[in-house]
Amino acid sequence: MIKLKNVTKTYKMGEEIIYALKNVNLNIKEGEFVSIMGPSGSGKSTMLNIIGCLDKPTEGEVYIDNIKTNDLDDDELTKIRRDKIGFVFQQFNLIPLLTALENVELPLIFKYRGAMSGEERRKRALECLKMAELEERFANHKPNQLSGGQQQRVAIARALANNPPIILADEPTGALDSKTGEKIMQLLKKLNEEDGKTVVVVTHDINVARFGERIIYLKDGEVEREEKLRGFDDR
C-alpha cells in the first residue's frame, strides 16, 4: 500500500546540506494502522508530506497503492491525493464561511464537477458525517459554532468524502484536550478496523501512538527503531 525505498530528502541552507530524511525504508500494508513518532526536527512531517504526495524525495522511490509517484506530474499527483488519500490536520483547516456539510462536500465538487448532483453530494456528505460520528443536527453549523472535537470530526468526514483507502493524520489530537483527543483516536481506530482504511498518524504523544499496531520512531531523519504493539496479521 505505502512503500518508501531508500528515501532521502535534503534542503540547502547557504552552502550547508540539511538532511530532513536519510535513507528511509518503510513498508505499510493495506489496512494497517501505523504511528510515526519523534522529536521536533526528526523528519515526521517531511515523511508524511512525501507519503501524501505533497513533496518529493531528493533520492529514493515512493509507492502509493503500487503506483510509483516520483515521476508523476502535478496533475497526476493531484489525482493521487484526491482519490487515494484523505488528510486530517491538527488545526482542522475548515473553511469558516461554509457549514460542516458544505466543508465535507468540497472534495466531491472538486472530483466530480457537474457529474454528481447536489442531492447526491449532500447524501454522501451526510453519510461521511455519520461515519465521523457527528450528529446530523450539527450539519448546518459553521466551524465557529462547533467545539474543537466536532470540528475535527468534520475534518475526518471531509477526508472520507472520496472514499480514499489511506488516511494521513498529522497531530490529529494536538489542538484538543486529552478526553476529546482519545475519542478522535477511537474514531480513527474504528475506521481502520471496521472500514479497512490504512491509517498513518504522526504524533509526539505516546498515548496517541499506541492506538497504532506499530510505532516507527524517527530521529535526525532516520528510522531509529520500530515497536510492534499488536499483530496486524492476527486480527
UniProtKB/Swiss-Prot annotation:
Gene Ontology CC annotations of this record: plasma membrane
Pfam families membership: ABC_tran
InterPro entries documented for this protein: AAA+_ATPase (IPR003593), ABC_transporter-like_ATP-bd (IPR003439), ABC_transporter-like_CS (IPR017871), ABC_transpr_LolD-like (IPR015854), MacB-like_ATP-bd (IPR017911), P-loop_NTPase (IPR027417)
Annotated ranges, domain ABC transporter: 2-235
Entry binding sites for ATP: G38, P39, S40, G41, S42, G43, K44, S45
SMART domains given in the database record: AAA
Keyword field: ATP-binding, Nucleotide-binding, Transport
Top-level taxon of origin: Archaea
Gene Ontology MF term list: ATP binding; ATP hydrolysis activity; transmembrane transporter activity
GO BP: transmembrane transport
Family in the record: Belongs to the ABC transporter superfamily.
Protein name, as recorded: Uncharacterized ABC transporter ATP-binding protein MJ0796
Native source organism of the sequence: Methanocaldococcus jannaschii (strain ATCC 43067 / DSM 2661 / JAL-1 / JCM 10045 / NBRC 100440)
